[in-house]
């Protein structure tokens, strides 16, 4: 009965204050009102600030009224004061836990100011780094740019030299091919002239041979005509001779 009666004072109806217990040491949303949860990290120089000292913190319930209420419910004054002292200790421990795990708005603003100061320090370090390291990098880049320009100029000169050599080789090869073509054309012209000369000689020989053949054929025709006349004469003489002999025999036979 006493335990139930004690926990009744921890309910929301007591003194109009929302003091709610939650298991495993977790805080209820009513206690988190007005606070912002945060995680504490030591990545920067944080200056811890205590806004409300322990002796100036106010309790969340009226201790005197609670002692009187306990006395009216059968507790003597010493027991009531002991219970209230225990409750005060629990309240202070809970508040310490709350102040350790959460921060107030003022603490948040101070932390933000510290973070901004830390960011300013980082920004200054970045400026210094830019003036030192980036200057070295810029100088190195300029040096590399100069070297690249030199290499580029060397490549241009080498390319120009190779192009000039190739142009000279091409001109020499073109001259050689032109001379070779001229020699071939000259040889072809000589061969053509020789062939024309041989052709004319051949045509002349053929013409002479043809004339000789025509002359021989004409003489043969003349000889054949003369032989034909001689043959006709001989045949005619033979026929007349035979007729004469036949008439002689006929006359001789007729006379006999």
Curated annotation (Swiss-Prot):
Signal peptide: none annotated. Pfam families: CCDC90-like. Residues 1-42 form a transit peptide. The keyword Coiled coil applies. Residues 106-164 form a coiled coil. Keywords: Coiled coil, Membrane, Mitochondrion, Transit peptide, Transmembrane, Transmembrane helix. One of its GO terms (cellular component) is mitochondrial membrane. It is found in: Mitochondrion membrane. Its main location: mitochondrion. It is a single-pass membrane protein. The chain crosses the membrane at residues 231-253. Interacts with MCU. Belongs to the CCDC90 family. This is Coiled-coil domain-containing protein 90B, mitochondrial. The gene is Ccdc90b.
């Amino acid at each position: 009965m006493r335990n139930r009666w004690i926990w009744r004072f921890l309910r929301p109806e007591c003194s109009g204050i929302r003091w709610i217990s939650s298991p495993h040491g977790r805080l209820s949303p009513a206690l988190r009102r007005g606070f912002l949860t945060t995680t504490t990290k030591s990545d920067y120089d944080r200056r811890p600030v205590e806004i409300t000292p322990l002796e100036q913190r106010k309790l969340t319930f009226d201790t005197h009224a609670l002692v009187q209420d306990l006395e009216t419910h059968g507790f003597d004054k010493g027991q009531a004061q002991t219970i209230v002292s225990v409750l005060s200790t629990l309240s202070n421990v809970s508040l310490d836990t709350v102040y350790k795990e959460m921060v107030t708005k003022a603490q948040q603003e101070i932390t933000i100011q510290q973070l901004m100061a830390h960011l300013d320090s980082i920004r200054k370090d970045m400026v210094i780094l830019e003036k030192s390291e980036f200057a070295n990098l810029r100088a190195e880049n300029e040096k590399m740019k100069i070297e690249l320009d030199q290499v580029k100029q060397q490549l241009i000169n080498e390319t120009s030299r190779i192009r000039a050599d190739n142009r000279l080789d091409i001109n020499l090869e073109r001259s050689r091919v032109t001379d070779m073509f001229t020699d071939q054309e000259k040889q072809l012209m000589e061969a053509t002239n020789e062939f024309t000369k041989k052709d004319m000689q051949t045509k002349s020989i053929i013409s002479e041979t043809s004339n000789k053949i025509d002359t021989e054929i004409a003489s043969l025709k003349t000889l054949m005509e003369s032989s034909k006349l001689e043959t006709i004469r001989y045949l005619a003489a033979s026929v007349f001779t035979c007729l004469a002999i036949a008439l002689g025999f006929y006359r001789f036979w007729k006379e006999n």
